[in-house]
């Protein structure tokens, strides 16, 4: 074992782009694991004999676990470094996927899903913080490239569901195939040269860290960035999770709605690529405001038109515009400087998942008790609030923040 560890240390991958490639790949497979649940909700509810409201509670509980691990990851990164936290997150995802393979009872499903979400929480913060820190001079483009992995994973997930339905494979076995890439990525991590944690982290250093984090979290500019993330990810996750359930109310079959979902997620990939080009020429805030405004218009149009073809076209246009806006928000938050990448990443991700905890449950409750159109009502309201918040955020307030953070 010592020889293997020594060999890994000697042969570490040192390429400048290796961290970006690893982050992209890890976020790709992490996204598939995270987004596979939404399209198979109709199968899970039948297989485990539970209602949509109960499923919404499970998703909210899992998202709460994700929220806690996200908050913890921001602090743990400062102490243990990127490699150990990424390794731990990957192991949790591996364990969660393995548990979901054997989820033939509701108890096993809840435990395995919670473990999976905890691993995702660690990896979302650690991988994006790593990219933001390592490529700070080109942060907007690098963050967008890394997050394209998330978007591609969201495309692959519904396609896997359609394939599993076509070959009559149980939804549990999808997670067996998702566990394999994590084993490979854990092995690659051993060879990857990644910054470590702080050595001899003292109690005074921990106190200073909490002091700085408190000031950053309470600053109006950072707080508004967190609120944008809160609203935006809630919109994205509720729309994606309850997508097939919404189309089932229109008498569209699961395999067809999964393909439509794949079209939507393909549009989000296209949107990420477009933003990757536009971010060089347009200020982050202006691009964010335009994207959210157009997203509202196209989602409202998709809701108003009853023709399925027209509805799919507007959903595609919605996907192009709604994609990549968390990356822009994160890039705006990083204007504070590379020193505080970990805490900004942790705050924005925690805010995102806090919104998902509430709105996933609300979407499930309203879909079960009122109408499956409820998710669109919720998302349209969130987009409208987003437009207002983005319009009032002001980057100039940041110039005073560095004076307030008085730590060594």
Regions found by a protein language model. Give the residues of each.
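Conserved MFS/SLC helix-loop-helix module at the cytosolic interface between two early adjacent transmembrane helices
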Residues: 68-106
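Cytoplasmic helix-loop-helix junction between adjacent transmembrane helices
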Residues: 112-148
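Extracytoplasmic gate region of multi-pass secondary transporters
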Residues: 37-38, 220-262, 266-272
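Helix-to-loop junctions at the C-terminal end of transmembrane segments
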Residues: 69-81, 271-283, 367
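A late C-terminal transmembrane helix in Major Facilitator Superfamily
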Residues: 336-372, 379
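Helix-loop-helix hairpin linking two adjacent transmembrane segments in secondary transporters
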Residues: 145-193
